[in-house]
Amino acid sequence: MARAKNGTVHVARRKRILKKTKGFWGTKKSNYKKAKDTLXKGMMYATRDRKVRKRDFRRLWISRISAALSDTGVTYSRFIEGLLKSNIKINRKILSNLAIEDVEAFKKIVLEIRR
């Protein structure tokens, strides 16, 4: 009886990896061994950066709010403290958009906090 070498599964596995590395540069897209290593590293970066993206956006929103507050003479920390005391429930993303797109509404919120 002939030995079954499982050829179709072997080819399918390699094909699946090489399909995922289609846009990679050099031998990383065509050499299975390098493609497999690069794909694993890419997946690690993707997993890490899904977490980092959240941090980066929060930092961006805070810096935008701080920049908008520099005209009003209120610091960011006092502003957030005032939001909590005034029981205004607006998150940093919305505040950042207000500071950029609707300056008058943002200034009204700052005036409300100063009371």
Curated annotation (Swiss-Prot):
GO terms for biological process: ribosomal large subunit assembly; translation. InterPro entries: Ribosomal_bL20, RIBOSOMAL_L20_CS, Ribosomal_protein_bL20_C. It holds the Pfam family Ribosomal_L20. Keywords: Ribonucleoprotein, Ribosomal protein, RNA-binding, rRNA-binding. The keyword rRNA-binding applies. GO terms for molecular function: rRNA binding; structural constituent of ribosome. Gene3D superfamilies: 6.10.160.10, Ribosomal protein L20. The keyword Ribosomal protein applies. It comes from the Bacteria. GO terms for cellular component: ribonucleoprotein complex; ribosome. NCBIfam families: rplT_bact. PANTHER family: 39S RIBOSOMAL PROTEIN L20. Belongs to the bacterial ribosomal protein bL20 family. Binds directly to 23S ribosomal RNA and is necessary for the in vitro assembly process of the 50S ribosomal subunit. It is not involved in the protein synthesizing functions of that subunit. This is Large ribosomal subunit protein bL20.
